[in-house]
Amino acid sequence: MEARSQCPMLKPRLAAFTQTLTDRLDLLKHRIDLSSKRLRFVVAGTVLLAGTASVATVTGTALAAPAAHAPEHPPVQEAQQAGALTYGLDISNYEPLYDWSDSQAQFGIIKATEGTDFRDASFARHWHELGQKGIVRGAYHYGHPANDPVAEAEHFLSVLNSQPAKPGDLLVLDLETTDGQSVSAVNSWAKTWLAHVKERTGVTPMFYSGWNFANTYGHGLAEYPLWVAHYSKDKGTVSPPADWKSWTIHQYTDYPIDQNVSALSADQLRDLGRQTA
């Protein structure tokens, strides 16, 4: 039980200070993570793909119209129970020279945008190479809750729509920082961004975050497929946070590059993406 403060002003000031400190630590961690990813990629030279899950060959079959969207979570739960995992990577401009043609990945998700004006310099190249390879591809936006969510969503869509689209392309919100906003504000921001992209595209976007962040700020987002980072869990063994009943993608390591497994097959992943080009 929480003790009552003797000073009525102490508790709100302490809470504000704690939130500010937490946000600064989150931002610092994000910057350190990005720097370490670049260093690890340079040192490693090539991505270590030994021990990755093998999956069926991707067919690239065209999909149905947006109205015929497949149920999202039952296939996920079935795949998890069956133990089937599909291996994939996520890439940004910190790995600008990554060679997709020599990759064992069955899906690739790449950074497109951040905030209201940043465009990843390597997005177009990665997007084109993934299209040529023919595996499932997706694009993600790194969100900043201090900004207008609709403005950020529109920035993401404008960059995404500047490139050729294919059926099965995945859309993702990457949310890892609060920018000093409250839990309810961050949660509302995410709901607005996701709903806007869904309305504009007919695609239910995926939500990405670390497990702890998603568990705190992700309540009420269970309609959006979950991509969760949890490095202390073996690949495919993570439990869903907040009120998600299942996960769709588990990012299980960031060494020497971000590596993931999906509980879905490649074709099932495509069902979550664009239904038409």
Residue ranges with predicted function:
Residues 1-39:
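Terminal targeting segments of Actinobacterial cell-envelope proteins
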Residues 25, 29-31, 48-49, 53-115:
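Boundary/entry segment of secreted carbohydrate-active catalytic domains
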Residues 38-52:
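Sec-dependent N-terminal signal peptides
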Residues 68-101, 221-277:
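Functionally critical loop-and-helix segments that line ligand-binding/catalytic clefts
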Residues 81-104, 110-203:
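Substrate-binding cleft of extracellular glycoside hydrolase catalytic domains
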Residues 149-151, 212-223:
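Glycine-rich, charge-decorated loop segments at or immediately adjacent to ligand/cofactor-binding or catalytic sites
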Residues 178, 212-213, 233:
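Short, solvent-exposed loop/turn segments at secondary-structure junctions
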Residues 202-215:
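Aromatic-lined carbohydrate-recognition surfaces of secreted/lumenal glycan-active proteins
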